[in-house]
Amino acid sequence: MMSSSSSEIDVVKTRIPTYDEDDDTIFYAYETKPDFVNKEPNTVSDASCNTEEQQKTVNDVLIHCQVIYDAMQNLDKKIDVIRRKVSKIQRFRARFLWTNRKRYGYKNYSYQLAKKLKRQKMKKNEVHESFSYPESYSPTLPVSRRENNSPSNLPRPSFRMEEYQRAEPEEDPILSRTPSPVHPSDFSEHNYQPYYASDGAMHGSSSGPCLGNPGANSIYNTYSTDHASAAQPSVTGSLFGNDCYIEEGSITKHPSTWSVEAVVLFLKQTDPLALCPLVDLFRSHEIDGKALLLLTSDVLLKHLGVKLGTAVKLCYYIDRLKQGKCFEN
């Protein structure tokens, strides 16, 4: 008999002959087909093949992931190299800009000058309306000579002011309280004669070059009060043919004590045609003697806006002033 779980498709039915002719019973023999016998092992092998394919696919995915990871690592390395190169370029550029920057020497000077001017402005309580001091700064005004022999009382030289020329020397109230400056024309150009060797009054000169006095510091030490009481300078309209009157012996220290008005007077007397346009500029910036000696062509051109020719002339006069030389127009 054929089992219920099997079918005719999976078995081979064979009729078995009988030798009993009276019996109508027919016998069949059933055999399983060879294909059906090997069907279950084939199913197992197919499952194993599918497992291998899945494992191979997983391996391929892992390999691709590893390749992607390696690529990302290489990309990170390249990014690090690029960052190092960029930082190196930035450092090189900063070092280049620092080493090749424009050196403005006037910046520090400008800061000090502004600070100095501000400090002077705070200390200044009143505006100087005229060029006047307790001592006489005009060589055209004859005043009595000091009788004190102290070298610290040596008068300071200055320039001739045109507004003082029309003043009467005898009627000026300043004469009674101001000393007389040491006039360099009291000594000859080729032969130096001290005051104690001269007789009578001091001889004023109206012409001749500016002459330094090498013995100016020892004049008052050897000068007698008897000669000082008899000495009176003469009033002259012009000192040396030009408006400059500076002692070479004291010019190295005296210009630093000038006020703003003294600097303005220096500009007017030195070169009126070229330097008079700078008067208002110097007054607005309150440039005194110390600031004048510190001026350079860069400061004049870039900060004060002075023209090139005027700046060159003024620098030349400042250099001459530092050397203690007189200016001849």
Curated annotation (Swiss-Prot):
Region entry Disordered, spans: 125-189
Modified residue annotations for Phosphoserine: 138, 238
InterPro entries in the record: SAM, SAM/pointed_sf, SAM_Scm-like
Biased composition (Basic and acidic residues): 159-168
Keywords (A to Z) from UniProt: Nucleus, Phosphoprotein, Repressor, Transcription, Transcription regulation
SUPFAM superfamilies assigned to the protein according to its UniProt record, in alphabetical order: SAM/Pointed domain
Name of one Pfam family that matches: SAM_1
Primary location recorded for the protein, binned into one broad class: nucleus
GO CC annotation, single: nucleus
Lineage summary: Eukaryota, Metazoa, Chordata, Craniata, Vertebrata
Keyword Repressor: yes
Protein location: Nucleus
Keyword Phosphoprotein applies: yes
Role this protein plays: Putative Polycomb group (PcG) protein. PcG proteins act by forming multiprotein complexes, which are required to maintain the transcriptionally repressive state of homeotic genes throughout development. May be involved in spermatogenesis during sexual maturation.
Residues in SAM domain copies: 258-325
Family the entry assigns: Belongs to the SCM family.
SMART domains with a match to the protein in the record: SAM
PANTHER family the record matches: BEN DOMAIN-CONTAINING PROTEIN 2, SAM DOMAIN-CONTAINING PROTEIN
Gene assigned in the entry: SCML1
Protein name, UniProt field: Sex comb on midleg-like protein 1
